Amino acid sequence: MELKDVQAIDTMCRVFYCEPEIVKPHFDFYEFRTMAYGTFGGVMKKLGIAPGEEWKVVASLYKPSFEAMLAEMDEIGVEKVFMDATKMWSFRHKALMADYSLELVADRVRQGKGRVVGGLSYNPFEIKKSLEDIEKGVKEYGFKYVWFHPISFGLAPNDKKCYPLYGKCLELGIPVTFQVGHSAEPLPSEVGHPMYADEVAIDFPDLKMVLTHTGWPWVEEWISMLWRHPNVYGNIGAYFPKDLSPALVEFMGGRGQNKVLWATNGFGLTRCKKELVELPISDGAKRKVLRDNAANLFNL
């Protein structure tokens, strides 16, 4: 398969992928600063990033403008990218450390003229407003999904504070996507164990769910969830395809090829697509992961 053979769909890009400087305020928070020196410590050193400029370590992965992102999409064969109104809670500071607005995402969707798929997010400490925003985003702006970061709120996906979200997504007929696995930021990650989604999948059998971020370090459990539940899918965002576990690659190329979605988490469309195309799986499986599964799941 050549790079442009499939017009891919990135099911978890980020609003800041085309505007790097908007991540600056995140690095006022302990979690993001610590992530820079931990998860991204090698990159920090390689790029010679100085204290106080930690935001540049993630910005180095992004494009300088919306136009540059569209040009990259055209160059490598990416038809659509997903962007959501991300909300994340600081465990240390007890405040939202990421809080993107519905309106910002709507602007990205308008700019994209069909190339950007809009999504909402969820704050379980502001349930009423979150549900109102989700309904508005879907009904007025045509947004297609919700992405939720339960780990940052200290909640497992089966916590009762999350259930209003699932009910609303089911009512609106949209998938819910949420992070499982550990968090790159220093957040208590036990609640990210993929098996906590088991009860949700059973309680909401008609709700389409996407478990994001591969579930690492519990990849086998993530695979189990996708394989056992007809309504559960997963994406590989935040991990470069060449670094995926052999078990995940085997699953993606075999019995799980209809359940896995391509995603970058803003880590670079070109590198992430190139490495996916180079994986030792069939072209048919690659096509499903890069495009077909997303098109079917999100009714694109």
Give names to the regions the model predicted:
Residues 140-148, 154-261:
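Catalytic pocket-lining loop regions of alpha/beta-barrel enzymes
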Residues 79-178, 183-184:
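Active-site gating/metal-coordination segments in enzymes
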Residues 14-16, 86-90, 123-125, 151-155, ...:
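Short, solvent-exposed loop/turn segments at secondary-structure junctions
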Residues 10, 80-85, 121, 210-212, ...:
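Short beta-strand segments
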Residues 12, 73, 105, 137, ...:
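Conserved, mostly hydrophobic/aromatic
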Residues 1-11, 18-75, 79-80, 136, ...:
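Mid-to-C-terminal alpha-helical segments outside catalytic/metal-binding sites
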Residues 66-70, 102-109, 134-135, 162, ...:
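Generic structural signal for well-ordered alpha-helices
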Residues 19-25, 94-95, 131-132, 189-190, ...:
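Short aromatic-enriched loop/helix-cap "lid" or pocket-rim segments at secondary-structure transitions
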